[in-house]
C-alpha cells in the first residue's frame, strides 16, 4: 500500500466513526497530547479569524505562533477544511 493509500485509509477510518468519543479514542491512540492541543489551537484560531478577529486579537486569545497563524489564515482563505468549523456549530 502506498503512502497516499494509507493516508486515504486514515481519512476513511475517521469518517466512519460515529461520535466524538470514538474520534477522541482514535486520536488519543494516534497522536501525542501536544499534537492534539496544536490541532485544537489551529481550529480555534481559524474560528476566530472567520469571525472577523485580527491577527493581534487571535494571538492574544490563543497560544498560536505568528508563523502558524499565517498558515492557518492562508488555509481559511484558500482551503476547504476550516470552513466546516462554522457549518457544524
Go through each PLM region and give its residues.
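Short, Lys/Arg-enriched anionic-surface-contact patches
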Residues: 22-42
Amino acid at each position: 500500500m502506498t503512502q497516499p493509500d494509507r493516508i486515504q485509509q486514515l481519512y476513511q477510518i475517521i469518517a466512519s466513526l460515529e461520535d466524538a468519543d470514538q474520534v477522541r479514542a482514535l486520536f488519543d491512540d494516534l497522536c501525542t497530547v501536544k499534537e492534539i492541543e496544536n490541532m485544537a489551537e489551529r481550529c480555534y484560531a481559524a474560528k476566530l479569524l472567520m469571525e472577523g478577529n485580527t491577527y493581534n486579537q487571535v494571538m492574544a486569545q490563543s497560544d498560536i505562533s505568528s508563523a502558524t497563524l499565517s498558515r492557518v489564515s492562508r488555509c481559511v482563505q484558500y482551503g476547504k477544511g476550516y470552513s466546516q468549523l462554522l457549518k457544524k456549530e
